[in-house]
Every structure is written in C-alpha cells, then in structure tokens.
Amino acid sequence: MIKNLLITFLSLTVFGFILYHLGVFDNLNSAGRDERSLHSEKRTETVRKTPEFMIGSVYNSIDIPAAESVKGAMLASEILRSNGMKIKYITVSNCQKRPETAAALQKMCVDYRTGAFLGPGNSEMLTSLRAISQFYALPLISPVTVRPDKLPQLEYDNYVSIFPPLEKWIDAILAHMKGNNIKKILIITPGDGTYGEMFSSVLERNSKNVLNDFQTYRMTYPHPLRTNYFNNSLTNYGGQHKVDAIFFGGVADELPELMQILKNHNINLPVYVSDDIIRNEIKMPAGTAFKLFLPEAEVPVSNAKWMELYVKKYKKQPSYHAVLGAETMFVMAEKFNKSIYTPESFVKAIEHASLEFNKKIKIRIIDFSTGKL
C-alpha cells in the first residue's frame, strides 16, 4: 500500500515538473492577475518593439482650448521629427459627443503600439476617458485639464496634467480682488459635473482662507432656465446684498446673456470669469460699462524654433493653450526612453516634470476692455 502511494506521489511530482517546464503554470498565473497588469505588460512589450513613439489625441475641433493644444502639439511633433526623433502623432478631430470620444480613445488603447495619449481637451470628459485608458494602461497626459477634487483615487493612476492647478488660477483671482478691496462676491455657476462648478467650489472654499471678512453668495443655474436664474440672482443679490463683484463660472456662449441682463438692470459691478472663457470667444454687448476680468496663463516657451514656426505658419502669437500643447509634447519626448518604457514609469516621469514646469507658469488677470493687466 505504502509502495503504491509512493509511486503515485513520485509520478505526480515528475508530471508536475514536466508541466512546469512546458510553461503551463505560467498561463494559470497570468489568468489570476488583474487585466490591467496584462494590458500594461502587453503595452510595454509592444512599445519597446515599435520603431516610432506613437502618441494619440481625440478632440472636438470646435472646442478652442482642445484644438489649440493639439495644434501646438502637432507643430512640436514636426520639429521633433526634423531633429531625428522617430515619433508619430495620430489625431482624431471629429469627436463632439462623449460616446464618439470614448470609442475613438478605446480604439487607440487597444493598439498597443500607442505609448501615450495627449488629452483629454475637456475636463468634463476626464472621468470617463481616464477610466478607459486606466483599464488599458495607456498614459493620459493632458495639456489643458485640471484634476478635480472628486476624481477617484487609483492605485496606478495613469493621468497627469501639465495644466496649472486650480489653486494657481484662483489665487491670482483672489489676489486681484483683494487689491481692488472686493469683500463680497456673487458666484453664478452651472450645475454639478461642469468645469465651472468645480472652479466655483474651490474659489468659494479658498476665498475664506485668503481674504478677511470675505462673503460669498452662490447661485447655481440649470442650463434650460438660465435666463430666469440670471435675472433673479442679479436683481436680488446685486441690489439687496450689495456685492462688490460677480464671479461667473459659465461658458463663453452664456456670457453675452449675462452681460445683457447686467446692462438692462444698470448693474455696473466688475465680472470675473474662469480660464474656461478665453479672449477671442468673448462678444460684449454694445454700450456695456462694467469691467470684465479674465485670467490668462503666461507659459514660457522652451523651444525658440517652435515659436518662430508657429508665428510664420499662423501669422499670430500662439495662445497659452497652444504653448501648453507644445510643451506637453516636448516633455513627453524628453521623458520617453524606449528601452526602459513602462506605462507606470512614464507617468511618474511626467508627473515630476509637470511639477517643475508649473513653477515657471504665472497667472495674470486681464482687463478685457483694455487688454491690460
């Protein structure tokens, strides 16, 4: 009996040893790992074998910050190629809705030759696009989005932004308000999930730490009924509470309506907006007397050749969104090392570079009526 058991045990041991050397248990181990790790390993292996550093972008061509950042990044990639770097920048520009954008990103994710994704160009798309790219272990490097407070924490976070953090923008706005002796503001903001709502929340929270005796009154409006909300809030708060200024967290398309209501009610309070509204989007109603202040980033250009070619090609100075797109491309090219590339190590390298880069960026407040600080 014992002899038979011993023979059986030895037979199983030898059989297991043979299976081990045939690699059968390797497949079982792989099946037990999480899928993200498998995608990461596959991307690492494929990117290292691919002749070119492949970068993708998906954006809406009518979204000015996104389009400008891609324009800057594209020109930067052309300079890198002319300098001998093997780099390929693939863009998809006709994605106006979330499902289209998500589908285009997923297509890039499953092409494991893609080493990084430059984007997204819209903060409202961030959560869903981050989830997709996180699953497929594709680094998500954005020139023009900020990290929301409510963004879920992940063990392996694949998202990095080169864009200045919200606090930097808000500190500049609050410092400008303090310099103009503003102590009471009416915050008019769109609903949850929008960039304006996120910006307004941080502004309201940080104002209490920066300005003494600072008071905020907040009104959140739904898009379909915004005209009534604008009217009620401006007549009630503008007169009854005597606020010193208004902060508007909406988008450029909504600003003229707000301005017209201010004009109709003869309210000449200064209006501050977020970085989501840029100069060439603004159309002021005729005869407006109030001040409009908007923040702009002063971003240093690291590559003189890029600036020279941009002005020559587009016959104008680049927007800061275009510069951020270019600098993101240059940073990714600098930190990419094919022989040691992994999605995780690449993200860490970009994170460190982003912190250093943001130290060089200054935020200034522009008076739209004069174009001066």
PLM region spans:
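Extracytosolic ligand-binding ectodomains
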Residues: 2-373
